[in-house]
UniProtKB/Swiss-Prot annotation:
Function: Nematode cuticles are composed largely of collagen-like proteins. The cuticle functions both as an exoskeleton and as a barrier to protect the worm from its environment.
GO MF, one example: structural constituent of cuticle
Compositionally biased spans, kind Pro residues: 205-217, 241-251, 307-316
Organism expressing this protein natively: Caenorhabditis elegans
Chain spans, region Triple-helical region: 128-157, 176-202, 206-235, 240-266, 269-304
Biased composition (Low complexity): 127-157, 183-204, 219-234, 256-266, 276-295
Family affiliation: Belongs to the cuticular collagen family.
GO cellular component, one term: collagen trimer
Name of the protein this chain belongs to: Cuticle collagen 12
Pfam entry (one): Col_cuticle_N
Keywords linked to the UniProt accession: Collagen, Cuticle, Disulfide bond, Repeat, Signal
Subunit structure: Collagen polypeptide chains are complexed within the cuticle by disulfide bonds and other types of covalent cross-links.
Matches recorded under SMART domains: Col_cuticle_N
Gene name as annotated: col-12
Length: 316
């Protein structure tokens, strides 16, 4: 039983849409997780640092109020109940640190003095000092031209008896560029005929002309008288010119072998001139990795001088 090709094509198209939708949703979810998770982690860390700073500040305030209460109790002579340590134990604050804070409570201290600046501890403000200033950035693109300014106020009127001269103006007006050529005008009327010119006088004779072509041949003349008889002729033998070379003859028999020649006495020649430079060789193999360098010196411990002063109530 064969299936309908149209039905198969429809199912393929529907499955293609479902696959495309699934891939798009998974891609968007992945990108959202990549961007949202670090942002959420950073926000939670910021909130934790802020809450830790606020909790330490509230703890500092409560310790101050408790010291005031103890001082008032000592002055009035009324014995009160013992302060519980559950709150401080939950925050990791020991009695020695409370005693140290109570002894130094009378002086005004910044937040950095409360949290301590010993090695391995964090400042109460939850952030480090500002780093060094970075290098200046590149110059930006030039901005657009500004709008034209408003026209200036009119000048004072000149007096009636004052005349404008070349020295009256305080600015130099250069000559403007020449204007375009105007349209050609209409043709003017014909001028009056001029006066007759002076006569040239008698002309000088010119040079002789070139020779003319030769004339036609004349009529042949009449026969002349018969001449005297000549001397008898002589027979002279003259050698003829040599004829062309004949064909080459057949080769003759081979001759006897000659005597062996003497050994040569020539010296070997000197070295020839230096040849051209060869092609550059292939790059060498990379060298072995160097040994790791020594560890650097430990950096200075951070201080809490950059933290803002505590937000205490008036009178503290």
């Amino acid at each position: 039983m064969t299936e309908d090709p149209k039905q198969i094509a429809q199912e393929t198209e529907s499955l293609r849409k479902v696959a495309f939708f699934g891939i798009a949703v998974s891609t968007i979810a992945t990108l959202t997780a990549i961007i949202a998770v670090p942002m959420l982690y950073n926000y939670m860390q910021h909130v934790q640092s802020s809450l830790q700073s606020e909790v330490e500040f509230c703890q500092h305030r409560s310790n101050g109020l408790w010291d005031e209460y103890k001082r008032f109790q000592g002055v009035s002579g009324v014995e009160g109940r013992i302060k519980r340590d559950a709150y401080h134990r939950s925050l990791g604050v020991s009695g020695a640190s409370r005693k140290a804070r109570r002894q130094s409570y009378g002086n005004d201290a910044a937040v950095g003095g409360f949290g301590g600046s010993s090695g391995g501890s964090c400042c109460s403000c939850g952030s480090g000092a500002a780093g060094p200033a970075g290098s200046p950035g590149q110059d930006g693109a030039p901005g657009n031209d500004g709008a034209p300014g408003a026209p200036g106020n009119p000048g004072q009127d000149a007096s009636e008896d004052q005349t404008a001269g070349p020295d009256s103006f305080c600015f130099d007006c250069p000559a403007g560029p020449p204007g375009p050529s105007g349209a050609p005008g209409q043709k003017g009327p014909s001028g009056a005929p001029g006066a007759p010119g002076q006569s040239g006088g008698a002309a000088l004779p010119g040079p002789p002309g070139p020779a003319g072509p030769p004339g036609p041949a004349g009529q042949p003349g009449s026969n002349g008288n018969a001449g005297a008889p000549g001397a008898p002729g002589q027979v002279v033998d003259v050698p003829g010119t040599p004829g062309p070379a004949g064909p080459p003859g057949s080769p003759g028999p081979a001759g006897a072998p000659g005597q062996p020649g003497q050994a040569g006495s020539s010296q070997p020649g000197g070295p020839g001139p230096q040849g051209d430079a060869g092609a550059p060789g292939a790059p060498g193999a990379p060298g072995q990795a160097g040994a790791p360098g020594q560890d650097g010196e430990s950096g200075s411990e951070g201080a809490c001088d950059h933290c803002p002063p505590p937000r205490t109530a008036p009178g503290y």
